[in-house]
Design a protein with these regions (language model features):
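Class II aminoacyl-tRNA synthetase catalytic cores and aaRS-like
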Residues: 1-202
Length: 202
């Protein structure tokens, strides 16, 4: 899972986290089980280069070994914050926590792809098994900073969910679409949506 640790990160004195949160960003982490011994600092540097392909500016890390946390941001974490992170991310001895701080779309894309990359690298996936997934409650829009505006995430003809109509004027990034997709092994098999059929909404 991509664990949202924004609330915890906001309590630190780490300027990168603070500035990102003030600008509407989030901080999420993935727990690589047993990863502390699998990835040296050089290995983590390679993972950092990987997430940069998805517009992430960097990758923070914490290793949990012998009941102690160590890593690139440990000096910004007092004992209480360390305990919160361990609890909220379900860290166990030997685990590695990888953290990205950025805008939500960048965080989700970079960490999601990093998770898949590590799974393949460590032979954690089984190509003989098929896991089907229905994707629902997909966001209507994504804000792209390089263009300075919102873009449709499904297609521009999809209608907004009833409870989110007012968000189109106030916070379009939080509005959800009436659409669905069927995915297997990360590949989309098919999907559909309710089209915009009200003149006033169009």
């Amino acid at each position: 899972l991509l664990e949202n640790i924004t609330d915890i990160a906001d309590k630190t004195d780490f300027v990168v986290f603070k500035n990102n949160i003030e600008n509407g960003g989030i901080i999420k982490a993935i727990n690589v089980k047993g990863g502390a011994s699998l990835y040296s600092r050089k290995g983590i540097d390679k993972l950092t280069d990987f997430v940069k392909k998805y517009r992430a500016k960097g990758l923070a890390f914490l290793k949990y070994t012998d009941n102690n946390l160590s890593g690139s941001i440990i000096k910004f974490l007092n004992e209480d914050l360390q305990a919160e992170i361990i609890k909220n991310t379900k860290l166990e001895d030997g685990d590695l926590l990888l953290i990205v701080s950025d805008q939500e779309s960048v965080v989700n894309q970079s960490l999601g792809n990093l998770r898949n990359h590590i799974a393949k690298e460590q032979n954690l996936t089984n190509d003989e098994e098929y896991d089907f997934l229905w994707v629902i409650d997909w966001p209507m829009f994504e804000y792209k900073e390089e263009h300075g505006r919102y873009f449709s995430l499904h297609h521009p003809f999809t209608t907004v969910q009833d409870q989110d109509i007012d968000l189109l004027d106030t916070d379009p990034g939080k509005a959800l679409a009436y659409c669905y997709d069927l995915v297997v092994q990360g590949q989309e098999l098919g999907g559909g949506s309710v089209r915009i059929h009200e003149t006033t909404l169009q």
